[in-house]
Amino acid sequence: MMSASPEFYKPAPVFSPCSSPLRLLQQQHGEDHQEEYGYGSSGGCCRTPTGGESNLKAPGTCPPAPRKPRAPAAPCRKRLFEVEVLSLRLEELERLFWRPPPPPPTTQPQPQPQQPPQKRRRVAKLGS
């Protein structure tokens, strides 16, 4: 890597009131403009404004700290109604959930589904 050569180093320019934009404004407009902006015969180039419009207002009261919003109400876990219990006999249940009986077994022998052929395994022979 290359390091910066000291011959190319330039320090930052120092602030000078002569190069201030206020000083340039003073030179352009003359003495009447100096008194208007307050940097005339008093010797300084800037001063704190003392007019009524620049004064701070009286401190008011601070607003309250922000609060976390309340969580929405959870659904009620308590039962608000009576549960009606029904008692049914087995015949009534079978009638409600009736399934057709399975088909009777056939006397013809069904063909066996074909088995997929066995996979061949390769065996490595040692010492041949």
UniProtKB/Swiss-Prot annotation:
Record region (Disordered): 23-76, 96-128
Keyword Cell membrane: no
Name of this chain's protein: Cyclin-dependent protein kinase inhibitor SMR1
Top-level taxon of origin: Eukaryota
Cellular component terms (Gene Ontology): nucleus
Keyword terms, alphabetized: Cell cycle, Nucleus, Protein kinase inhibitor
Any one Gene Ontology molecular-function term assigned to this protein's record: protein kinase inhibitor activity
Record's compositionally biased regions (Pro residues): 99-116
Function: Probable cyclin-dependent protein kinase (CDK) inhibitor that functions as a repressor of mitosis in the endoreduplication cell cycle.
Source species of the chain: Oryza sativa subsp. japonica
Compartments, record wording: Nucleus
Ranges of Basic residues composition bias in the record: 118-128
